[in-house]
From Swiss-Prot:
PROSITE patterns: TCTP_1, TCTP_3. Belongs to the TCTP family. Pfam families: TCTP (PF00838). This is Translationally-controlled tumor protein homolog. It is found in: Cytoplasm, Cytoskeleton. It comes from Aspergillus oryzae (strain ATCC 42149 / RIB 40). GO terms for biological process: translation.
């Protein structure tokens, strides 16, 4: 299995267990699922809760909540959404830091070139739809953390996450 960590904070962000789709040679998108966590009421197969007197909350959600699978699996956190102009400044600073980190780690020249050439195209795509995104960050809430952008596909039902490909580092486990 391959875990992808934020290149600046070291936070685990995503793994190859998800189907990563490359966009514009710089972004990765992955479809997510809403899962229910909390208030696990474990019942044995074949058990009859009403006969056991355990159907008091039948149909109730209790303390269960719906979250995105990647948020739960990688301990991602909701992050206050910046105004569009603030985000623009923040993302430009983030891209400079990623570029510096790629150079520091002696990434291949073609990787650095790919990042430089495609960053503006990706940023324009993101800014055009920025109002539709929710934002997550890694577990550390680091100041330099990648903003993971969450939106919904055209069907309005399927959530997906967007990551900066060059802002992730691969670790095999």
């Amino acid at each position: 299995m391959i875990i992808y960590k934020d290149i600046l904070t070291g936070d685990e962000i995503i793994s190859d267990a998800f189907n990563l789709k490359e966009v514009d040679n710089i972004l990765w998108e992955v479809d997510c699922r809403n899962i229910t966590i909390g208030d696990e009421n474990i019942q044995l197969e074949g058990a009859n809760p009403s006969a056991e007197g355990e159907d008091d909350d039948a149909g109730g959600a209790g303390n269960a909540e719906q979250v995105l699978d990647i948020k739960h699996n990688f301990r991602l956190n909701d992050y206050p959404k910046l105004e569009k102009d603030e985000y623009k400044k923040a993302i430009k600073g983030y891209m400079k830091k990623v570029l510096a980190k790629l150079e520091e780690k002696k990434a291949p020249e073609e990787t650095i070139k790919e990042f430089k050439e495609n960053a503006q195209t990706a940023l324009k795509r993101i800014l055009a739809n920025y109002k539709d995104y929710d934002v997550l960050v890694g577990e550390s809430f680091g100041a330099d953390a990648m903003h993971i952008l969450i939106n919904y596909r055209e069907d309005g039902v399927t959530p997906y996450a967007t990551f900066w490909k060059h802002g992730l580092e691969e670790y095999k486990v």
